Amino acid sequence: MKHYLLDTNILIYYFNGNMERTVKDKVSTLIRESFQISIISKMEFLGFPFNLQEKQKAEQFVACATIRPLSDEIVQHVIDIRKEKRIKLPDAIIAATAVQYSAILVTRNTKDFNDLALETYNPFDGG
């Protein structure tokens, strides 16, 4: 079974319904199979200024995910990535988390993760 780690942008698009039906179907399938997110994605996603009703729905949505915490191994991998690549800290944490858990990173921003040793998947791409 494949494992998928959803990037924050995918959480936002999916939660807000900002995707075509075919893309939503792809993401829904991934969520049913393996709904995992990094702790940083939880912080980024729940840090959005939701109204009270949206906030409750967002918290329920995230509660369905397996939250992957920071570990010493992930921290070391983040340090190694940032020494070699110009990448934002949250992206480095998400990438290192995907590698640590042998997960495919599901993101719309695959270019942010070019040159890193991990598999990415953009559900917005055709096919």
Model regions and ranges:
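Residue-level signal for well-ordered alpha-helical positions
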Residues: 17-18, 48, 81, 116-119
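Short, structured coil segments at secondary-structure junctions
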Residues: 31, 63, 116-117
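Acidic, PIN/NYN-like endoribonuclease modules and their adjacent C-terminal/linker elements
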Residues: 3, 95, 100-127
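Nucleotide phosphate-binding site architecture
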Residues: 11-12, 46, 114, 121
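Active-site neighborhoods of divalent-metal-dependent phosphate/nucleic-acid chemistry enzymes
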Residues: 66-108
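Alpha-helix capping/helix-boundary segments
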Residues: 10-11, 41, 74, 93-94, ...
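Generic structural signal for small/hydrophobic residues in well-ordered secondary structure
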Residues: 7-8, 45, 78, 98, ...
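Short, well-structured N-terminal submotif of metal-dependent ribonuclease cores
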Residues: 1-37, 47-59, 127
